[in-house]
Amino acid sequence: MITEKPLKFGIQNGLNVARAGYTEDQILTACMLADKTGYDSIFYMDHTNVPQWKNAIVLDPWVMLSAIAAVTNNVELGTCVTDAIRRHPSNIALATITLDRISKGRAILGIGAGEAQNLKEFCIPFEKPVSKWEEQIQVIKTLYGSTPDHTVNYDGKYYKLEGACLQAPPIRKPHPPTYMAAGGTRTLELTGKLGDGWLPIGYTPELFEDHAKQIQVSMDTHNRTQKEKDNFQYALVIDVYFSEDAEESWANMK
């Protein structure tokens, strides 16, 4: 059973913002307003490009989130989502910690297994993404607790660490939460095994409930503690269109 929690609201700087061609200053202004008016979180997409919309402006999420952190005080800040292919897990771990420190403990790592877009045209192999995703999250969490006096090792199929460490401890304890983007049987199972939250997009209530139950079964299977289960966050990204005319809003939604 999902532990009842207060309902929170955030904003997503996703394809909608990129397609609109908003400038950096406009995005920062909107984020400052969201922070002042009581929104709980701000997320930022991670794409290299969206060539189907030629006039879109596509920016780096980690740089933008750091800029947003500097002009906000309360909102949590996360990627929605970065992927497990384009960056080495050490880079993702350090970027997340850096954002957490700049924001004084407000960082969230939203991460998925990736997609062919943004990979193939840059000749980045799109192979075994879910297996790499699992190892990435394990490596990232291992590195969160590393120091020069406590180096870490990892011997995976795709990633290896030998006496590795980072030198910037996160503010959040034990580390920034990991929200996993999942919708398939295996990815839902891994979310229950490794995640601190779940970040699906565009679900119906029925599908959300079904997939949430699969995550809960995985939590039980992998002996997650009751505290981990209670603290697990169930999120959902949905599109919202504002208009004085309901039919116009529905047309935009479609």
Task: Please report, for each region that a protein language model flagged, where it lies by residue.
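Active-site-adjacent structural elements that line small-molecule/cofactor binding pockets in enzymes
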Residues: M1-K254
